[in-house]
Amino acid sequence: MADVSVDQSKLPGVKEVCRDFAVLEDHTLAHSLQEQEIEHHLASNIQRNRLVQHDLQVAKQLQEEDLKAQAQLQKRYKALEQHDCEIAQEIQEKLTIEAERRRIQEKKDEDIARLLQEKELQEEKRRKKHTPEFSGGSVFGDNYYHEDGGMKPRGIKEAVSTPARASHRDQEWYDAEIARKLQEEELLATHVDMRAAQVAQDEEIARLLMAEEKKAYKKAKEREKSSLDKRKHDPECKLKAKSAHSKSKEGDEAHRSKIDRPSRPPPPTMMGLEDTDPTHFTNQHSTTWHLPKSESSQKGFHNKQ
């Protein structure tokens, strides 16, 4: 086998070979560092996107729950208001019926009183027609006197006693009318007191229901706020964020050391990836409703008065 001869004059020097080897090694190291940086960048982007998607889902879920709670609360307020309106309308109808009944009763009483008065007048006229007029003692003679010798005739005594009986009957009728009116006033006052107590009871029930609704809504808001804070302060999320920050810091230091090296050719160009900034969403909760106290019952009551 023939020996291969090597021209020693064309061989490069040791320094040139070392320099070329150093350049090749630098290229290889730069390429590996760049690949590591790209992989780290992709991993951080994926993790960021996952966090953003998770935050979006949580925010959307909380917003839907808040909207549902508001809709339910508004529905309950409307139902309570409608119930108050129905109660007020019922009370107003009862007051109207009571006033109409009282008016009819008063009219009947007036008619009865008028009939009684006409009857009394007719009886008085009839008594006057049937009662003879006496002129002294000439009708019965001069000897028609009392046993005690008085001058008072018997016919005049009967004429005086008849108006006394009529006035006594009128007094009884007047007393009965006053007693009836007093009894009606007492019944009316009792009915008014019962109605006022019912209205006050309805107002108290409405106030208690409204207070319970406010407490329930406040508890729901506090529960949502605590769950959101717990998700924000989750230790697993903190550990993931710290590891991502340390990896990015190591990549930045390696890249800085690569740039600081002198007299090295630029690394091969690579396609860069654009960073996607995470979008933060804030969940704005609506404020609580101040429903005024339902005054429909009071309005109906005062309108009637």
From Swiss-Prot:
Widely expressed. Residues 122-142, 218-305 are annotated as: Disordered. This is Coiled-coil domain-containing protein 50. Residues 218-239, 247-263 have a biased composition (Basic and acidic residues). Interacts with RNF126. GO terms for biological process: sensory perception of sound. Pfam families: CCDC50_N. Involved in EGFR signaling. Keywords: Acetylation, Coiled coil, Cytoplasm, Phosphoprotein. Residues 279-305 have a biased composition (Polar residues). Residues 86-130 form a coiled coil. The modification N-acetylalanine is found at residue 2. The modification Phosphoserine is found at residue 5. The lineage of its organism: Eukaryota, Metazoa, Chordata, Craniata, Vertebrata. GO terms for cellular component: cytoplasm; microtubule cytoskeleton. It comes from Mus musculus. Its main location: cytoplasm. It is found in: Cytoplasm. Phosphorylated on tyrosine residues. The gene is Ccdc50.
